[in-house]
Amino acid sequence: VVGVLDAGLGDTVTPEDRVFWLDEYRRNYKGDVGRERLRTASINLRDRDSLHARLGSVTCPVLWMHGTADAVYSVANAEDGIRRFSQSADAQLKIVDGGQHFLSASDPQHVNPATVEFINKWR
Protein backbone atom coordinates (compact mmCIF):
# COMPACT_ATOMS: atom_id res chain seq x y z
CA VAL A 1 0.00 0.00 0.00
CA VAL A 2 2.81 2.42 0.83
CA GLY A 3 4.31 2.15 -2.67
CA VAL A 4 0.94 2.80 -4.30
CA LEU A 5 0.32 5.70 -1.94
CA ASP A 6 3.73 7.25 -2.63
CA ALA A 7 3.22 6.94 -6.38
CA GLY A 8 -0.24 8.47 -6.14
CA LEU A 9 0.74 11.36 -3.88
CA GLY A 10 3.95 12.23 -5.69
CA ASP A 11 6.45 14.63 -4.19
CA THR A 12 4.29 17.74 -3.81
CA VAL A 13 2.26 16.67 -0.76
CA THR A 14 3.41 18.04 2.59
CA PRO A 15 4.98 15.61 5.08
CA GLU A 16 2.01 16.14 7.41
CA ASP A 17 -0.49 15.31 4.64
CA ARG A 18 1.58 12.28 3.64
CA VAL A 19 1.45 10.96 7.23
CA PHE A 20 -2.31 11.62 7.37
CA TRP A 21 -2.98 9.71 4.14
CA LEU A 22 -0.65 6.86 5.08
CA ASP A 23 -2.52 6.45 8.38
CA GLU A 24 -5.86 6.55 6.53
CA TYR A 25 -4.73 3.92 4.03
CA ARG A 26 -3.43 1.64 6.77
CA ARG A 27 -6.74 1.99 8.62
CA ASN A 28 -8.80 1.45 5.47
CA TYR A 29 -6.91 -1.66 4.35
CA LYS A 30 -6.47 -3.25 7.80
CA GLY A 31 -7.49 -6.84 8.53
CA ASP A 32 -9.37 -9.28 6.34
CA VAL A 33 -11.99 -6.74 5.26
CA GLY A 34 -9.29 -4.23 4.35
CA ARG A 35 -7.29 -6.78 2.37
CA GLU A 36 -10.43 -7.71 0.44
CA ARG A 37 -11.07 -4.01 -0.23
CA LEU A 38 -7.49 -3.59 -1.51
CA ARG A 39 -7.79 -6.70 -3.69
CA THR A 40 -11.00 -5.37 -5.22
CA ALA A 41 -9.44 -1.96 -5.85
CA SER A 42 -6.41 -3.58 -7.50
CA ILE A 43 -8.60 -5.72 -9.75
CA ASN A 44 -10.63 -2.65 -10.71
CA LEU A 45 -7.46 -0.79 -11.69
CA ARG A 46 -6.17 -3.77 -13.65
CA ASP A 47 -9.44 -4.39 -15.46
CA ARG A 48 -10.59 -0.82 -15.93
CA ASP A 49 -10.54 -1.08 -19.71
CA SER A 50 -13.66 -3.25 -19.54
CA LEU A 51 -15.47 -0.21 -18.15
CA HIS A 52 -14.80 1.82 -21.29
CA ALA A 53 -17.45 -0.04 -23.27
CA ARG A 54 -20.13 1.13 -20.81
CA LEU A 55 -19.19 4.81 -20.62
CA GLY A 56 -21.27 5.69 -23.67
CA SER A 57 -24.44 4.91 -21.71
CA VAL A 58 -23.67 7.34 -18.88
CA THR A 59 -26.06 10.28 -19.07
CA CYS A 60 -25.27 12.18 -15.87
CA PRO A 61 -22.78 15.08 -15.85
CA VAL A 62 -19.14 14.04 -15.44
CA LEU A 63 -16.23 16.06 -14.09
CA TRP A 64 -12.90 14.32 -14.64
CA MET A 65 -9.88 16.04 -13.14
CA HIS A 66 -6.43 14.74 -14.03
CA GLY A 67 -2.93 15.78 -13.02
CA THR A 68 -0.10 16.10 -15.51
CA ALA A 69 2.29 14.40 -13.05
CA ASP A 70 0.04 11.35 -12.54
CA ALA A 71 2.42 8.38 -12.40
CA VAL A 72 -0.40 5.86 -12.88
CA TYR A 73 -2.41 7.15 -15.87
CA SER A 74 -1.41 9.69 -18.51
CA VAL A 75 -3.29 12.78 -19.64
CA ALA A 76 -3.83 10.94 -22.93
CA ASN A 77 -5.70 8.22 -20.99
CA ALA A 78 -7.94 10.89 -19.45
CA GLU A 79 -8.55 12.53 -22.82
CA ASP A 80 -9.52 9.19 -24.30
CA GLY A 81 -11.71 8.37 -21.31
CA ILE A 82 -13.68 11.61 -21.27
CA ARG A 83 -14.50 11.26 -24.98
CA ARG A 84 -16.22 7.96 -24.19
CA PHE A 85 -18.94 9.75 -22.16
CA SER A 86 -20.76 10.48 -25.42
CA GLN A 87 -24.25 10.59 -23.87
CA SER A 88 -23.32 12.62 -20.79
CA ALA A 89 -25.21 15.86 -20.24
CA ASP A 90 -21.83 17.53 -19.66
CA ALA A 91 -18.50 15.68 -19.72
CA GLN A 92 -15.66 17.95 -18.66
CA LEU A 93 -11.96 17.18 -18.37
CA LYS A 94 -9.91 19.58 -16.28
CA ILE A 95 -6.15 19.15 -16.40
CA VAL A 96 -4.19 20.24 -13.33
CA ASP A 97 -0.58 21.16 -14.10
CA GLY A 98 1.74 19.19 -11.83
CA GLY A 99 -1.14 17.30 -10.22
CA GLN A 100 -0.53 13.77 -8.98
CA HIS A 101 -2.67 10.61 -9.22
CA PHE A 102 -4.31 11.36 -5.87
CA LEU A 103 -5.26 14.81 -7.08
CA SER A 104 -7.49 15.72 -4.17
CA ALA A 105 -4.50 15.22 -1.84
CA SER A 106 -1.84 16.89 -4.01
CA ASP A 107 -3.93 19.79 -5.31
CA PRO A 108 -7.01 20.45 -3.16
CA GLN A 109 -6.75 24.13 -4.05
CA HIS A 110 -7.77 23.15 -7.61
CA VAL A 111 -9.99 20.15 -6.93
CA ASN A 112 -12.23 21.56 -4.21
CA PRO A 113 -13.45 24.74 -5.94
CA ALA A 114 -13.88 22.99 -9.30
CA THR A 115 -15.91 20.24 -7.65
CA VAL A 116 -18.13 22.67 -5.75
CA GLU A 117 -18.70 24.72 -8.91
CA PHE A 118 -19.60 21.59 -10.91
CA ILE A 119 -21.98 20.28 -8.25
CA ASN A 120 -23.66 23.67 -7.87
CA LYS A 121 -24.14 23.84 -11.63
CA TRP A 122 -25.96 20.51 -11.73
CA ARG A 123 -27.86 20.23 -8.45
Predicted regions, residues:
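Residue-level signal for the nucleotide or nucleotide-sugar donor/cofactor binding architecture
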Residues: 33, 73, 106
